[in-house]
Amino acid sequence: MDYKQLVAAALAPALPDLTQEAILDKIEQPKTSKQGDLAFPTFTLAKTLHKAPQMIASDIVEKVDSSDFEKVVAMGPYVNFFFKKDAFAADILNQVLSNGGHFGDAKLGEAGQVPIDMSSPNIAKPISMGHLRSTVIGNSLANILSKLDYQPVKINHLGDWGTQFGKLITAYKMWGSEAEVKADPINNLLKYYVRFHKEDVDHPEMDDEAREWFKKLENGDEEATHLWSWFRSESLKAFKKIYQRLDIDFDSFKGEAFYNDKMQEVVDILEDKHLLQESQGAEVVDLSKYDLNPALIKKSDGATLYITRDLAAAIYRKRTYDFVQSLYVVGNEQTNHFKQLKAVLTEMGFDWADQIHHIPFGLITSGGKKLSTRSGRVILLDKVLDDAVALAHEQIEAKNPDLPNKDEVADAVGIGAVVFHDLKNERMNSFDFNLEEVVRFEGETGPYVQYAHARAESILRKAGSPEIAATEQTLSDPAAWDTLKLLSEFPATVVRASTEYEPSVIAKYAIHLAKAYNKYYANTKILVEDDELNARLALVKSVSIVLKEALRLLGVKAPDEM
């Protein structure tokens, strides 16, 4: 049962001028439990009803059928609803226990496909902390949408094309070795590329050779294509090791190169629709009616640009997946690019352009400075994960040295801490990254939530395996009531996270639930043999289920022991 819907339905006859949706939007959580469980404010009705809000609240209470509630009372300008605690508890616990991890599932997406463009590192360059946000936000959104019956398609749009490959081929032929690349593809390919840029200062002829190699690559030369393909596959092997650590997989690795033969169609459509204009020798699409700068489609030398490739990709994805939404999890510095992309698609006559959504995000900083810049502040993601796991190991050794599967748990805690810290921050906010803070077991961290789950599992192990069922039994501790209400909010929280494309909604919910449960745990002797034992165990089991599922939606594991 959705209790917000129940309140809205009770209010509807008393508010004939408001739709059910409008009533739902106004319902809020009171500040304290003394003010009830849900409340309806009447301030906004004062103008239309020409009455004081307090009087409106009193009038509504008289018209409301309160039989589904313990009581409905007017408190100043609010109509306050108090739930029947025993029935509410039994209903919520029954929903969680009977559905397990599927609690909160909903058939909203009707199996519609949603491509998610995410992560997208450059071939022959390391995955840095700069890639973390796109990767974990995209993965979490895929999990959330999947829970609501969408079919996410995780696309890693690799940076696998461009003039840099001419330089890389030149550098490899001058100084490279197959054995070195196979042993450590990313670091050695990067080493060759960096050396190229150092040496071409005194040897400008190297630039000519690089241009020649890229031209060969564009023309399908056998050797150039073989080397490019090999650099790509070796890099991808290295990338997949990191994705494996994060427990993230992809449905497609089609990168920039895949669209090489698909861009001409874009140019043809733009020409057919007379959308291309000449500007200083280049070809552009005028977007002044959208209050945007012109979209540069072709440079004066005839070379196509990034947006042309993205237009080709958008058209390909619509044809391939017939998507209901198409998401691009890309930093907020690209906001203008995606506005242009949608505007050009609209001008081309594609009415599905509105289904494209840019999911921007802020930066990760260190000491207030951007992490990944040309000043050499690149922090490798692999190294951060190693350090996080090592820190988790230290904490586990201190807290629980006899834990049987320490390595596995340290992995889940350390890596989970990094992912959780990223996702608990609203995605548009930039945040400072401090590893010691991130891997703490106290405070608003991933390990804190994981520990609350492990603590619940520990209680259930100690209880043995009794038949846990939700019955209308009183849970007398006030902290139990706060925990129950939070459990009831999980389905709506998942929906909100999906509509706002905001995983932090789930992360913050998990923190609140863990705090409420820890308060309950501290104030209640759970394993006492009395009439409430079954109800208490049902609550503990439900908390364990929902915390585990909330963490799963974020892409974080929930160990049963810590």
UniProtKB/Swiss-Prot annotation:
List keywords of the entry alphabetically.
Answer: Aminoacyl-tRNA synthetase, ATP-binding, Cytoplasm, Ligase, Nucleotide-binding, Protein biosynthesis
Reaction(s) catalysed by this chain, per the record, are: tRNA(Arg) + L-arginine + ATP = L-arginyl-tRNA(Arg) + AMP + diphosphate
User: Pfam families given for it?
Assistant: Arg_tRNA_synt_N, DALR_1, tRNA-synt_1d
Q: What is the residue range of the motif 'HIGH' region?
A: 121-131
Report which superkingdom the organism of origin falls in.
Bacteria
| Intrachain S-S bonds | none
Primary subcellular site in the record, as a coarse category: cytoplasm
What processes does the entry annotate via GO biological process terms?
Answer: arginyl-tRNA aminoacylation
Q: Which SMART domains match?
A: Arg_tRNA_synt_N, DALR_1
GO molecular function, one example?
A: ATP binding
State the Gene3D superfamilies in the record. Answer: Arginyl tRNA synthetase N-terminal domain, HUPs, Isoleucyl-tRNA Synthetase, Domain 1
Q: Where in the cell is it found?
A: Cytoplasm
In short, the EC number is: 6.1.1.19
Please tell me which top-level EC class this enzyme sits in: ligase
* GO cellular component terms given for this protein: cytoplasm
Its family remark reads: Belongs to the class-I aminoacyl-tRNA synthetase family.
**Complex formation:** Monomer.
PANTHER family assigned: ARGININE--TRNA LIGASE, CYTOPLASMIC, ARGINYL-TRNA SYNTHETASE
Q: What is this protein called?
A: Arginine--tRNA ligase
Taxonomic source organism: Lactiplantibacillus plantarum (strain ATCC BAA-793 / NCIMB 8826 / WCFS1) (Lactobacillus plantarum)
Q: What is the lineage of its organism?
A: Bacteria, Bacillati, Bacillota, Bacilli, Lactobacillales
